Amino acid sequence: MKTNRRTLLKTAATTAFATTLFTGSKPARAQTPMNNANPKFRIRNGRIKQSIMGWTFNPMPTLELAKLCKEIGLVAMEGISPKFYPKIRELGLDISLVGSHGFKKGPVDPANHDECVEKITQSIELCASAGYKRVITFTGMKAERIDDEEAIKNCITCWKKVLPLAEKKKITLCLEHLNSRDDSHPMKGHPGYFGDDVDRCVEMINRVGSSSLKLLFDVYHVQVMNGDVIRRINQYKDVIGHYHTAGNPGRAELDDTQEINYPGVMNAILKTGYDGYVAQEFIPTWDDKALALRHAAEVCDV
């Protein structure tokens, strides 16, 4: 029997309908609009270990957010005060990343080294005592008197002061790359941030040469600054220690207002063998914040 284009399209449509009929839901897409989001979604596949960056859902109380995460099926939280860690653990959630120094005052400037070393050391000890595995670090902002090569050397010098302890305690220090292009909001972009080129961040990590220093690959920031996200995930898979998400442009929901194909990105991450956490770090704009988180969780539950 001769098969034409119309027959093929009809067969594909029938297959899609049958899939929806028997699974009860359509496959999640990054371009699903708010009015099509599933208000009852719970994570089913769980191949991506999803977490949430707590500050993005302010002013929602931390424990209210934690209970929502548990109900949806997220398995961890980060970016919250350590005073909540015991309650988070009682809910059965992990802490996927522990804070240290801020992104503005980083090791680019030697004047910040003592403070960075102190805060990173405290966070490593906290992780080791509580059974957590990752601590965040940043480069800090550029300084006019410091050229790029000197800035790189300064960062390396500072990190090498704390990495022996991290290695001993089996803790991973995660360097976050941030975009410097978006100046529309203080947390959507960070003009002046030194580590704004993901390739440069990887160069610094490789020059340090420690398995306890990895890249925090923020998909949103990489898309803004460098693009070619999936190729870079594959290229840098051996140095990636953590992931963040958000829609671009706007650092908002993973919906039809943004350009990143998150199901494709999540599948690419899985194909690299990565088994760590992917933290949702979008700033919700929908009136229903819980629905926004459910939607993002569904998009990433590939």
Q: Where do the protein language model's features map onto the residues?
A:
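Active-site-adjacent beta->alpha loops and helix N-cap segments on the catalytic face
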Residues: Y85-R89
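Histidine-acidic metal/acid-base catalytic patches
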Residues: K2-G24, R29-K70, Y132-K133, I146, ...
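Catalytic domains of carbohydrate-active enzymes, especially glycoside hydrolases
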Residues: L65-F84
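Active-site acidic/histidine proton-transfer and metal-coordination neighborhood
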Residues: A12-F22, R42-R44, G106-K214, V224
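Conserved beta-strand positions in the central sheet of alpha/beta enzyme cores
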Residues: E78, L97-G99, I136, C174, ...
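Short, conserved active-site loops that position catalytic residues or coordinate cofactors/metal ions
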Residues: L91-F103, F138-T139
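Short, acidic/turn-prone active-site loops that include or flank metal/cofactor-
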Residues: T56, G99-G106, G247-N248
